[in-house]
Amino acid sequence: MKKTVTAVALLCALSSTAIAPTFAADDDEAARLKAIEEYRKQIADGNPSDLLAMEGEELWRTPYGPKNQSLEQCDLGLGPGVVKGAAAKLPRYFPDTGKVEDLESRLMTCMERLQGVERQKVIDSPWRKGEKLRMDKIVAYIVTESNGEKIDVDMSHPKMKEMYELGKRMFFYRTGPFDFSCATCHGKDGQRIRLQELPNLTKHEGAAAGWGSWPAYRVSNSQFWTMQMRLNDCFRQQRTAEPIYGSDATIALSVYMAANGNGGVMLTPGIKR
């Protein structure tokens, strides 16, 4: 009997010890989130992406390529040359190509048609160098012109619906030696890696926050990342084959995220740790 009482007392003591830190942990979590939010506000003041956007606007207006033409007649979906609000409505179906295109793939179409810059030249260029660096700067300019706009991706066309379903399948597809998918990190509420919260991209709130804040400047490596680069890095982390730049794979994933985030607000370029 004495042993039983002692065991029960010990169990209660251990239980109390285990339960007590829960409240402290909750307090610590709230304080941590508040501190991170304050940090993000501070680093967002004077986003370095603004410098790239200024260069991108100049590149948009400057004649270039074999045809020595600017991109000022590029139709991003709202009419030739209209940049304001265009990124908030991408990806979208374009009748002139018969395809669904995101921002980068549409820009490659314009570069090829207007300037004579071959699409493959952009695809083959290393990240943040050559034609891809030019692309990054132009992307920074265009998404800046949609900052504060509502995410408004038109899903009415059948090809957009097809892309959404393809993107959804890819999002949940497990691959690589670690056997995980996009959903492993971004398919549940309340997940994080170290200090980084992971938005649930299957729900509106998470998709709006995730999609609506990319492209972004990454403070940790002092680099501007487009959505194409961000998605490629996800594949790299899966230790699987990275998709071709501007391929249907990345466009489909973008359609899935953007459609889930419809109605949210574009805060682009974002700024990340």
Curated annotation (Swiss-Prot):
Cofactor comment text: Binds 1 heme group per subunit.
Signal peptide coordinates: 1-24
Binding residue positions for heme: C182, H186, C234
Primary subcellular site in the record, as a coarse category: periplasm
Binding residue positions for substrate: R230
Catalytic residues in the record: C234 (cysteine persulfide intermediate)
Recorded catalytic activity of this chain's protein: L-cysteinyl-[SoxY protein] + thiosulfate + 2 Fe(III)-[cytochrome c] = S-sulfosulfanyl-L-cysteinyl-[SoxY protein] + 2 Fe(II)-[cytochrome c] + 2 H(+); S-sulfanyl-L-cysteinyl-[SoxY protein] + thiosulfate + 2 Fe(III)-[cytochrome c] = S-(2-sulfodisulfanyl)-L-cysteinyl-[SoxY protein] + 2 Fe(II)-[cytochrome c] + 2 H(+)
InterPro entries on file: Cyt_c-like_dom, Cyt_c-like_dom_sf, SoxA
Keyword Heme in record: yes
Induction: By thiosulfate.
Keywords, in A-Z order: Disulfide bond, Electron transport, Heme, Iron, Metal-binding, Periplasm, Signal, Transferase, Transport
Any single GO BP term: sulfur oxidation
Name the UniProt record assigns to this protein: L-cysteine S-thiosulfotransferase subunit SoxA
Biological source species: Hydrogenophilus thermoluteolus (Pseudomonas hydrogenothermophila)
Name of the gene: soxA
